[in-house]
Amino acid sequence: MCSSDLAPCGVRSLSRWHRDHPYEMDAGGQHFSVGYLPADSDSGMFGGNSNWRGPVWTPVNLLIVRALLQFHLYYGDDWKIECPTGSGRLMNLFEVAREIGARVASPFLRDAAGRRAVYGGAEKFQTDPHWRDLILFYEYFHGDNGAGIGASHQTGWSGTVAKLIQLFAYLTPEAALRAHDMRPMMSTYGA
């Protein structure tokens, strides 16, 4: 997993590498450029709702985790990759899946200062005792800082972070290699 693809809160929808290396083309006498944007679109290109150029989407990360677990069943513990790229850390695919799962869950957890990344600069949700523990499941997340963006009641897909937490709380790498141990848990989140 390239470090420019991996955000603090999961895998970005478009690599941060494209911030400095946008995709560019000329068509119909016009110049088009698509680069990394960690949050909402900065132009009307593609209708203006181009929030696929950098934010983190929970359902995509869930599919990546599922695929990594499936490949881990085939390759086992001995097949390792560097994650993130350039870190020098070698991980098997189960460990990479668990790393992504932990990153997806991280915006909802309090940091050392008691703040949740999901709430960004929304002080009412960060500090008010009546609101600070009411977790909102946003549509997607800022690709650089994990702040929730878009609709704030997307429990249909961002709420699936609970399944990732549950999965990695109970599933061990050893159990993952015994496919029959994993199937009941995998089936509960769409496998």
Report residues per predicted region.
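Acidic, mature catalytic/reactive cores of soluble proteins
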Residues: 1-191
